Amino acid sequence: FNGQTIPLVGVRVRCHHLLHFEECFTNANGEATSLGSFKQPARYKIFWEDQKYWDIRDGLTWQAKTKGPRMTGRWELVISGDTEDAMFAAIHRACRAIFHDNPFGITRPKRGRIKLCAFYKKDVGKNGDHAGITVGIWPDIRIFRKVKGNTRSRWEITSTALHELGHASHHRAVVELPGSNRIEDFVLADGILKESWARGIQFAFMNWLYPNQVNKIRPDYFENYTGVVEGLMNQGLTLKQ
């Protein structure tokens, strides 16, 4: 978004040669420092999933992963452009911000791992969607890179992921948490309420991820997608309130 190289925290990295496997998660500097050592060239792979909270899929079914080289020594990967790997990384950043960092103290979406499907080539005319109830292989969240023939950037992918995770947070707070069970309140809620809340999540978290911008990062506001949450935050209220 601002041209800086950003370390990816909490990425699952695996290194293996034959039956020798080593695995760890990247630290605050984006480094996998606990992979052990190999006498022979080893294959690197990244699996875009969290142990506890989320699982990113390549399309509907396949695990999202990045295949690295077979080599000795240190593998340095810089993800740039609008590649498929960049899409996975963009969704990962959104998940990390919501589930682990959670600077605004909102309700974490879903008990157990949430499934987010990334569609790199498929175009169905929408940025993404969230399903409160899923069956079989159907995901909780779908995110699309192409929308009506237009290709969206990494930061737009992150913003969409935050929006859909905002819906998932809303669903859990109203329906899933102990003592809530107000499914009708969620199902029958006006679209303007649901979409404006998710827009507020986008606004707050995108500006937290990319601070010190000359102008605030704002999602498009139109019809049901209003800026009421931003307005309330400007009046001193917090997202949690």
Residue locations for each model-derived region?
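Short Pro-Gly-centered beta-turn/loop motif in secreted/extracellular proteins
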Residues: 33-43
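Short, acidic Ser/Thr/Gly-rich low-complexity loop/linker segments typical of extracellular
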Residues: 16-33
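Active-site recognition of the HExxH zinc-binding catalytic motif
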Residues: 159-176, 195-199, 203
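Auxiliary, metal-adjacent structural segments of Zn-dependent hydrolase domains
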Residues: 85-146
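Short pre-active-site segment immediately N-terminal to the catalytic Zn-binding motif
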Residues: 143-161
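Short, ordered, surface-exposed loop/turn motifs in non-cytosolic proteins
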Residues: 1-19
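A short, solvent-exposed loop/turn motif at the edges and junctions
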Residues: 45-67
